[in-house]
């Protein structure tokens, strides 16, 4: 089937495959409070689940309102499984370079050159002498030129486009790697064939050029003047855990990539029992299974090594972390805490608490201090890792002579209002409604719903997680918010 598809199109054009996925949250104005009391469902239809014979999990969310499907393959493998090496991210790039049948005019002739390139990268990783390294790099360059004679750049993307595909992309996080795109439902056979094929027999071609792309990405991040401070905070917060190293890899590791290590990473984690397929849109789950068994069912069966959660350091005994920000005149302070994880019974109350601090309408407790000029700006943030949820807030005093101590005091005064229940009932209901409305809108859009299900699969929350969360949001009371806010007290670990 794949060979037939390839023969239909042989067009090459330059494209970039990697893009960090951005998840957007939509908020409504407080006028929607007038609609309180009406029913609301977090999802438009239930998710249908089944497992292929090789252990691969399939979640299908049908939505026949538009003729499109959003498909995502989720691998529970990311930066935490290769700390500091950047292998998960490197491999994500390689997955767009084709297979033994896609992206090549003659794989049998190409393979010896690719094997030689892999061996040279292994040699480079073990060589410290600069002169010898330069010789190896030059040899790799000459081998890459020879191998390039057989490569067809961008063929995978072109095939996806030929068969109704768009938005082709991927991303790597600490906990997962996700490959996704939108496609027309009449091409589901071709989509399944192409996407399963690259998960069975990826070929590590055109690596030298992709290495340069990753370096450019690293340099792009390095151009951010706040990056050094962010990386220092990351090492401090997560020391002793797989989350302390940069996701893209350390500079030293990036200089010594090994294709053989990427192959081992693929063999270890890209197995049926460690992968999920999410399909949202105009598909019929009841008729899909035979097709998926013929395509994704070909992926090698197996389970990945068990992940062990490493405890975070005890932040309560750590000193304040002092960071230098390269912004003249501006001072900033903040706090970072552990938050309730995604399936924690207090999760819904925690989300309401964060919304009461700051929201799109700028009516939160921290927002009010910005609106009235008590400080320049403030914002709470929360982020969910597979193992932990972090909650934090940063604040900036008035410029140029605002006091950081005063801003700190104002911050805790607002937190105290949460702990003491000094919140208007309508503000509580508005926060709940806003969060529920976001869940509802996510359920109405194939891409947003897919994003929710990708996260739920990766973090092992279950496909019913959005509904579970919506049910608990409806039940949140002010007493729940007070209880959840109580642990956040002055004197715990700070960032400034």
Place the predicted regions along the sequence by residue.
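Bacterial N-terminal signal peptides that target proteins for export
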Residues: 5-28
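An aromatic/glycine/proline-enriched structural segment found at the starts
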Residues: 198, 202-206, 219-222, 237-247, ...
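Bacterial N-terminal signal peptides
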Residues: 28-37
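M16 family metallopeptidases and their MPP-like homologs
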Residues: 61, 66-81, 87-90, 104-197, ...
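Catalytic Zn2+-binding segment of zinc metalloproteases
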Residues: 93-103
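Non-catalytic, conformational "gating/processing" segments within enzyme and secreted inhibitor domains
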Residues: 204, 208-212, 226, 230-231, ...
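Boundary at the C-terminal end of the N-terminal hydrophobic targeting segment
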Residues: 41-44
